[in-house]
Amino acid sequence: MTGAASALRYWELRQEVTANNLANASTDGFKAERVFARLLNGAPVIGTHTDRREGAVHQTGQPLDIALGGDGFLVVNTPAGERYTRGGALQIDTEGFLADRDGNRVLGAKGAIQVGAGTLVVDRTGNAAVDGKTVDRLRIESTAGGATLDHAGATAFVPGATRTLVADDKRDVQQGHLEDSNADSLGGLVDMISIQRAYAAVEKTISVLDHVREVATSQLGKGAS
């Protein structure tokens, strides 16, 4: 039963992850998750990892939209601490600070970036100017040093246990653009059908094994009496 139970957990996780990827197929900056299964010291290990491939970039013409090239991430300040995101649909909060879609303030080298009612211009290296005056430089950090990331929301990440992110020396910022989700909606729908079939097959196998065990137990009981 151990193998069948592990298979059931695997397909359950595949279903959950695929559903989440599909739900975020149109979320800018979203990075799809993938499920893996392997043996470690003879025992099955099932988990997920983030697909960090870049999504397509499209032009919006909106000055508060930011797309990042390479593997850099914007740094935002949340109630739970700093988080990393490629979700570039930014806004100005009620106090005039640059913030992400969830209201978390985007950080620059000096801290939160105050824009107020001015016009924001961000160059390709992340320098932020308001009404022609440079006020800060976006903090953009990278996983190039081998850091891993764990999901902390639709487009937010926290560093994994291995190491922290490093400053992105190859920063490429495009104002007026957004990066699309890298989730494949069509492929996800096809996967979901296959997953549901596989899940049903494993459930049937477990049901058959349960029945065989019950019959065997019953026969042993009769033999003992």
What positions do the PLM features span?
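Amphipathic alpha-helical polymerization modules
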Residues: M1-S225
